[in-house]
Regions:
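Short, hydrophobic beta-strand segments
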Residues: 78-89, 136-141, 175-185, 433-445, ...
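Solvent-exposed, non-transmembrane alpha-helical starts
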Residues: 76, 89-100, 129, 186-195, ...
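Membrane-embedded transmembrane helical bundles of large multi-pass transporters/channels
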Residues: 1-50, 54, 68, 160-161, ...
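PDZ/PDZ-like domain segments forming the peptide/carboxylate-binding groove
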Residues: 600-651, 655-658
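Juxtamembrane extramembrane loops of integral membrane proteins
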Residues: 49-117, 477, 482-493
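Extracytoplasmic
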Residues: 143-253, 264, 492-495, 548-601, ...
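Juxtamembrane segments of multi-pass membrane proteins
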Residues: 411, 416-541
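Alpha-helical transmembrane helix bundles of large polytopic membrane transport and channel proteins
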Residues: 97, 101-170, 176, 183, ...
Length: 889
């Protein structure tokens, strides 16, 4: 039976809705339970899967190059197995036979690309052998197992004389050998690869004198899956402790049960939705379900605390208390859920499939809280037995209430207010200093997903120490015509490229076709060092290629060059994958490519007032005109070309040019596959259109390998990071604007939140936690934590000022009621979230600590800075409510 309530006009609809939910409780309950059962069924079908392709920004130019050539030149999913002996060298029959068998074993692991295995015991690793009669052929280093020490000594001699092996696949001290295997990206099963490598490659061959270390992306994610069960234990432990804390706070099993119902229903809906739309759950994102469930529990604690308060206020009438609690908290609860859900959706801006899927599923999951928290809440309370009055009264007499009261009195005193403002001012200044160290990408050479002393990071570091660089950056050299890779100028440009980047401290070594040609030429001339150079004509280069690749199947030569000699690659093996180092290396790559193209065109450029001007023209480059086009020529009649000093470059191809950066971008885009290049030049006040034949035979294209795909991800995050933050805060601003119908109200709520965001970013910088595709979604969800706390306090202050008419009294009452529930929620969730620091997965542990800190800072801002600002600035959206006298029941 419906009851009459004397409430403000804007609340009447909510009270009516609460009554209707109770009246129609049976059909509503059945409907929710049926849907929950369906989603629960879907949730139990959910699998933990990491799809490598979904981690990449597929629209990025680097990823397009990576996808085109990963199957031939190598991708980002390599496993490196290092065999190291403690005593002696690897050149003994026993150790060499281990390497042989381990190489055969890794060739049987699921998903391996059989043509992209590198080992001194694999058929693809060859050396030049001069046979009787002066004939030369490329022969595998090992043809079978080694039976005598003489055979082992011969293999050592071969290795020491081969530039493509010594120092690359065998360490310089002869104590370690490296087996490198690339995996097909469409067949990556990290758990299976991890188990098979352990069973077939590692365990059978490790002994007292032989250590085996394994690293690489598939191995890294294999360890993540290995530790996934630990994450479940942390989750269960955290939730049990949180249940205990709720029981201690409410002194009632209902207070512990009601938020649990909310969390379980929301979890079933969220996990079921992920499976329903065909997505999967990444093991590194397991902390996300915990966070969203925590949000559901947080809202439910507020509702339960208000229900007890209204139960006492309405003379122990359960129905009136249920409806009043529902109606009074509907606005802040719904606004908080909406800001969280829409805030997560801004992740859709990042063109990474995994993040976009996460944005969609997390947003739905958060919206699902409205079902359990708002739609079902009055019904659950109606079915539950009403609490005993003694239990309700004891909540206001416990130690927690006394501590909150004293803290509120201290904060709102005149001296306390000044201390709060001073504290946040100093904190903002200190955070502003440290936040400059926050970077996009990984800040350390070790993997941030696992602890520094984890088996994976120890193995990675040992391999790095022995071989100097194991993380590949692949730059593709794509010719404009067939046989472009036989052009001596192209090979020399490759060689210059290698020497230029090898000066970077983060590049260990490099490899390209130029290395093969120099080595073959030297062997062809009886190992004379002076012949270890690139020949001057196409015919000699082609002959050397024929010598080296003759007798090799196409699948083996394809990893160096395609059958038409149109496309090859330069691979740089980097020492780490730090974000700043990746950016520097890629910048040097771009500088080399750009300067090489300008050198071939015979021009130098400079920027003048946002325009690109040709500053000088080289006399070394001679041109002749062939019909409408200009081409570089060595003919006697060749002369000056189409470019003149002082020309302003207006357009390249169809791409307009402004400053120097736009010219670099235009030149890269328009010369990618073109043999003819159109230029529009402004000369003496008029525009001159010219067409030149590309003076190069091949174009370098970035970038593949692990470093290339990480660079692409980092660039997308850097490009969208600021925009996401702006849109996230803008979304919150709009929602709060409509919630309180005030342009100033969002500023009061977002101000403390922005300061909390600044402090957390400073913490990330100080702890060497970078922004990457794994940390981004959790950081984005964390931004919304503080807004919920503030919404409950402001809404209660507005409600209280209608009774007291005094800002100070209203704010104090809000802190002692909603603020008390906020305090319990924040403190308990901070504690249980911090338990994630026990995880064996460093990423989950650091994210748990980070989000615990975020909750704590957001809470402190909501209960200190926000109320002080409300009291001292007396905003109109709050003061105007004093004129409204709340009707009495």
């Amino acid at each position: 039976m419906a009851m009459e309530y004397q409430v403000a006009e804007e609340k009447r609809l909510l009270y009516w809705l609460g009554e209707r939910l109770i009246d129609y409780r049976l059909p509503v309950t059945i409907g929710v339970l049926l849907l929950t059962g369906f989603f629960a069924y879907c949730a139990f079908q959910l699998r933990l899967v990491t799809s490598f392709g979904e981690l990449l920004p597929q629209s990025h130019p680097y990823i397009k190059i990576h996808n085109r050539f990963a199957g031939t030149f190598g991708g980002a999913n390599n496993i490196m197995v290092m065999v190291e002996v403690k005593e002696g060298t690897i050149f003994t029959p026993e150790t060499l036979n281990k390497i042989w068998r381990m190489t055969e074993a890794i060739d049987t692991v699921y998903g391996v690309n059989h043509n992209q295995i590198e080992s001194i015991a694999h058929r693809t690793v060859r050396y030049l052998k001069v046979a009787a009669g002066g004939t030369m052929r490329a022969t595998p280093v090992m043809l079978g197992e080694v039976k005598t020490q003489e055979q082992a000594d011969e293999i050592r001699r071969i290795v020491h004389s081969a530039e493509n092996i010594y120092g690359i696949l065998v360490s310089l001290d002869d104590k370690a050998a490296l087996i490198r295997a690339n995996f097909i990206e469409g067949r990556l099963d990290y758990r299976r690869i991890f188990d098979e490598v352990n069973e077939r490659v590692v365990a059978p061959y490790r002994d007292q004198n032989t250590e085996i270390f394994v690293a690489g992306e598939p191995r890294l994610y294999g360890w993540v899956y290995h530790y996934a069960s630990d994450v479940l234990l942390v989750f269960v432990l955290a939730y049990c402790i949180e249940w205990l804390l709720r029981w201690l706070y409410f002194h009632d099993w209902r207070g512990a049960l009601r938020p649990t119902i909310t969390g379980i229903i929301a979890a079933f809906w969220g996990l079921g939705f992920i499976e329903l739309i065909g997505f999967s759950l990444d093991p590194l994102m397991l902390v996300m379900p915990f966070l969203i469930t925590a949000r559901a529990v947080s809202h439910s604690v507020q509702m339960h605390d208000r229900y007890y308060e209204e139960f006492e206020r309405h003379g122990w009438n359960k129905r009136r208390a249920i409806v009043a609690a529902f109606a009074e908290l509907f606005v802040p609860t719904f606004s908080g859920i909406t800001t969280d859900a829409l805030g997560v959706l801004v992740i859709l801006l990042v063109p990474v499939v995994m993040l976009q899927k996460l944005a969609i599923t997390a947003s739905f999951w958060i919206f699902a809280i409205t079902v359990s928290e708002l739609l079902l809440n009055p019904i659950v309370y109606y079915y539950l037995k009403a609490p005993e009055p003694e239990i309700v009264l004891v909540r206001d007499e416990g130690i927690f209430r006394r501590v909150v009261t004293r803290a509120v009195d201290a904060i709102l005193s005149r001296r306390g207010q000044l201390a709060v403002l001073a504290f946040w001012l100093v904190a903002a200044g200190v955070a502003g200093y440290f936040v400059r160290g926050l970077i996009i990408g990984d800040p350390t050479s070790a993997s941030p997903l696992l602890w520094p002393d984890s088996p994976y990071n120890v193995s990675h570091q040992r391999i790095q120490d022995k071989f100097g660089g194991v993380e590949p950056l692949i730059v593709v050299a794509e010719g404009l015509d067939r046989d472009a890779m036989k052009d001596p100028a192209t090979l020399r440009r490759m060689e210059r490229f290698q020497r230029t980047l090898e000066r970077d401290p983060s590049v260990g070594y490099s490899f390209s076709l130029a290395d093969i040609i120099r080595a073959v030429n030297s062997v062809f001339h009886e190992l004379e060092p002076k012949w270890g150079v690139i020949p001057n004509n196409w015919v000699d280069v082609g002959g050397l290629f024929f010598i080296y690749f003759s007798g090799s199947p196409p699948t083996e030569t394809a990893k160096y060059v395609d059958p038409s000699y149109t496309t090859a690659h330069v691979t740089f093996f980097c020492k780490d994958h730090k974000g700043e180092n990746i950016r520097r290396i890629l910048r040097r790559c771009k500088d080399f490519i750009f300067s090489g193209q300008l050198e071939d065109l015979g021009i130098e450029v400079e920027e003048d007032k946002g325009r690109t001007i040709i500053s000088s023209v080289s006399n070394a480059v001679r041109w002749e005109q062939a019909g409408p086009s200009w081409l570089v020529s060595t003919a006697e009649h060749a002369g000056p070309g189409p470019f003149q000093r002082g020309d302003r470059i207006v357009r390249v191809g169809r791409t307009p040019v402004g400053d120097l950066a736009s010219f670099r971008s235009a030149l890269t885009v328009e010369t990618a596959n073109a043999s003819l290049i159109d230029f529009a030049l402004e000369r003496n006040g008029s525009v001159v259109e010219i067409t030149v034949v590309a003076p190069w035979k091949a174009v370098f294209k970035l970038a593949g390998g692990l470093i290339g795909v990480l660079a692409a991800a980092n660039e997308e995050l850097f490009r969208n990071d600021v925009l996401m933050n702006v849109l996230g805060f803008a979304t919150m601003y709009v929602i709060v604007l409509f919630t309180y119908r005030s342009f100033a109200a969002p500023l009061f709520l977002l101000g403390p939140l922005m300061l909390a965001n600044l402090l957390v970013n400073a913490y990330m910088a100080g702890r060497n936690i970078g922004i990457n595709i794994h940390t981004l979604p959790l950081v984005t969800v964390g931004v919304g934590f503080g807004i919920d706390y503030g919404l409950y306090i402001v809404s209660r202050a507005i409600e209280e000022i209608r009774s007291s008419g005094n800002v100070e009294q209203a704010v104090r009452a809000a802190l002692l009621t909603s603020g008390k529930a906020v305090s319990f929620t924040a403190l308990s969730m901070t504690l249980v979230t911090a338990l994630w620091s026990l995880s064996s997965i460093r990423f989950n542990a650091e994210m748990g600590s980070l989000l615990a800190l975020w909750m704590a800072i957001s809470y402190v801002g909501a209960v200190t800075l926000l109320p002080v600002l409300l009291i001292r600035l007396r905003p109109r959206f709050l003061v105007r409510e004093a004129a409204k006298v709340a009707p009495q029941d």
